[in-house]
């Protein structure tokens, strides 16, 4: 990911297993919070947008267009964060976005992960639509943990034991 140091410049940093683990730990907490708040606060229009994005995600899986898949996945999460109605949470998540984006593609390119992601998103939307706060929180956390597990498997199946 890109690191900017004032008066020193910008460079692309190597990302370690520890960095990945830390990013996913933070993201699991933040997405869990956002999903729970969204279950309480989402509008019908936002819910409709999430459902439309799920359909688009499936269509792009069929064509194998990874650029569009990542674009739709990012839009899905953005709607979820906006639906939380918590500007500070959204700001914190946006600060992580560049780091998440730099590793997301690798996780999503793992065999079967795209379909798993679509199913996990569907489950999350179902809980949000039902206004099930706890279900939404659990689904969001599970989705992020599954993405982390897949990423670690894609890096090296022998190093993944659930903890780094």
Question: Where do the PLM segments sit?
Answer:
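Short linear motifs at protein or domain termini
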Residues: 1-40, 45, 82, 148-164
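ATP/adenylate-binding site constellation spanning eukaryotic-like Ser/Thr protein kinases
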Residues: 7, 17, 74, 86, ...
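Amphipathic alpha-helical effector-binding/dimerization core
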Residues: 20, 71-75, 83-89
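Amphipathic alpha-helical dimerization/coiled-coil segments
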Residues: 33-62, 71
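Amphipathic alpha-helical interaction elements
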Residues: 39, 58, 81-85, 129
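Residue-level detector of well-ordered alpha-helical segments, enriched
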Residues: 46-49, 68, 72, 88, ...
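C-terminal all-alpha effector/ligand-binding and dimerization domain
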Residues: 51-58, 63, 75, 98, ...
């Amino acid at each position: 990911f890109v690191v900017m140091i004032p008066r020193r410049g910008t460079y692309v940093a190597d990302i370690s297993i520890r960095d990945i683990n830390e990013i996913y730990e933070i993201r699991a907490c933040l997405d869990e919070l956002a999903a729970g708040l969204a279950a309480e606060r989402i509008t019908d229009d936002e819910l409709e947008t999430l459902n439309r994005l799920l359909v688009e995600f499936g269509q792009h899986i069929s064509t194998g267009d990874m650029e569009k898949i990542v674009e739709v996945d990012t839009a899905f999460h953005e709607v979820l964060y906006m639906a939380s109605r918590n500007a500070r949470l959204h700001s914190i998540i946006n600060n992580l976005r560049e780091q998440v984006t730099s590793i997301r593609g690798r996780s999503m390119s793992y065999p079967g992960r795209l379909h798993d992601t679509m199913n996990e998103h569907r489950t999350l939307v179902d809980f949000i639509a039902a206004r099930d706060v706890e279900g939404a929180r659990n689904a969001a956390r599970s989705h992020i943990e599954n993405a982390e597990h897949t990423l670690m498997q894609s890096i090296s199946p022998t190093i993944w034991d659930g903890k780094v």
